[in-house]
Every structure is written in C-alpha cells, then in structure tokens.
Amino acid sequence: MKPQNTKHHDQTTNWLFLLVLAVGALTLSGCSSTPPPPNWKMNAVSLLERAQQSWLEGDSKATKLALHKMRQEIAQTGRIDLLARAELAACATRIASLDFSPCVGFDTLAADAAASDQAYARFLAADWAGLEIKALPAHYANMLAEKDDANANLAARKIKDPLPRLIAAALLFRSGRAEPSTVAAAIETASERGWRRPLLTWLEVQLKRARSLGDQDAMAALQRRIDLILGQAKPP
C-alpha cells in the first residue's frame, strides 16, 4: 500500500511512517466536522522530509537538527512504535548513499516496533532469508522475489520512485550483486535529483571499477565529475 504524498519530495520509503501520520492531512479537505490533524503529526512529517532532503544534499548539520526536532514532536505522544518507524525511515535514506552503519535509533526501540517495521529493518539490513515479501513496500517485491542476479538488478532499475530505486541498488551492492548498469542507473538517479551525497558515493564506486579495469578515459571523466561536485573543478 502506497501512502498519499502531499509534498514534492518523494516519501514512498516512509510508507509505514506516513501511513499513520500523513494520512491525517487528508481530513483537511473533507467534512468540516472532521477535526484537523494534530500539529505534532504535520510537524513530524515535515521534519522527516527535511532531514531526508538535507542528508541527500549532503548537509549533515541540518539533518541532525531536523531529526532532533522530529524526535521531540513524536516523543510528545509517548508512541515508541512511531518513533521507531521514523528512525527506520531515516536509516533507509542513509542506505541510498551506501551508508550501511547500524540503525542504532531503530535498534534501541525495536522491542516496541511493529512486526512490519521489524520486517522492513531486516530488509534494509539485507537479511532476506525467509522474509515475507508482503510485509514490505510493494516497489521492492519484484526485486526480492528474483533469485537470478540479472533479473533482480532489472527489477531494481525499474522501480519508479527515485529514493527506493537507490535503496534497492544499494542493497544489491551490499550483497555483491549489483551490476555495472545498476550502478550507472544509481548515478543517473542521484544526478537527476541533485542529490549530492549519494551521487558522490556512487561515482566513487564507478571510479573504483574503472581503476580496476585500467580504463584511463573513464577514470578521468569520472574524476572531473567528482571535482565539479566538490567545487574543485579547474576553471576554463
């Protein structure tokens, strides 16, 4: 089930979190007798979006601040399960940049997390053995169902939403299954969105491969792109 999205930034990765929080916004256009959603819901969703966008753009300070404020908003409810859900969404965004560090924020709350959240956490940790596909966001179903590497890569590249597409590519990379075409697709996705952090990371992956092949032209071209992003490009 794909949650409704009320903002320009892709939020399908937050399917579990927004299913509970953002759906409240839909009542604003309904009957006048329906009370508006509480402020904490709207604030938490907005802050999570801000944290994700800041991370993807490479602004760690803004990410940290937005996550801190988001946690404060959710803490007002006493809902540990919702906080765990939000932490998981934040970790999923980091994975798009090949950051596979433990999801400490979720792990400390996992005992109170919903079963579906725990399944998603396993998916993000690439622990797929015996994982129930139906418990996960629908856009990952085809990739997870494929045992053949080529078909799994194709399924990942066909994911329509950019952030889940990057996450799928990252998880294939983590398991050593990502094909060069999937790495190229990840670069194209991050570039098109202007997501500096994952773009740099995926370009480094491609640069490493070019080095291993001794492809001097590819190495030079990739380094020029990296230098441009880092502001180190030589003036004309």
Predicted regions span which residues?
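Structural register within alpha-helical repeat arrays
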Residues: R50, A90, I167-A170, A186, ...
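C-terminal motif of bacterial Sec signal peptides marking the signal peptidase cleavage site
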Residues: T27-G30
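A cross-kingdom marker for long, charged
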Residues: L203-P236
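Extended amphipathic alpha-helical interaction segments
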Residues: S116-W195
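N-terminal Sec/ER secretory leader and immediately downstream segment
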Residues: P36-A113
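Hydrophobic/aromatic side-chain positions at a characteristic register within alpha-helices
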Residues: P36, W55-G58, A75, S175-A178, ...
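Generic helix N-cap/helix-start motif at coil->alpha-helix transitions
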Residues: W40-Q52, I80, K158-I167, R196-T201, ...
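Residues that mark the junctions of alpha-helical repeat units in TPR/alpha-solenoid scaffolds
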Residues: P36, N43, L83, E179, ...
